[in-house]
């Protein structure tokens, strides 16, 4: 069977990539006024479809990290990968530009500089490469 990725755009800079039973979620945000439609939101039922979820937070701005992501670990196996500029006490594996993390035999992540705060991420999952630029300031 041919491998495939399922990419879902949410809002602002947020999107997810599913590869088999792994879900990668980048800069998830419901919106300043919760404008992400209910039918597009990641729910506990969504998370339970995957054996592992990785949540990436590129930097500390509120529009790149909805607090709801920190409740997901109550219902699913979630690992957080966060920029080194996140406040002390933020849950997760911290990454600065130049860092590489091997999170499983199926997922490796490299952090690169951003044109604004934080980092950008290059994730290699199941042989596919996915780049998330983080915040763009140009």
Give residue ranges: language-model regions:
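Residues that mark the start of a beta-strand
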Residues: 6, 22-23, 108, 127-129
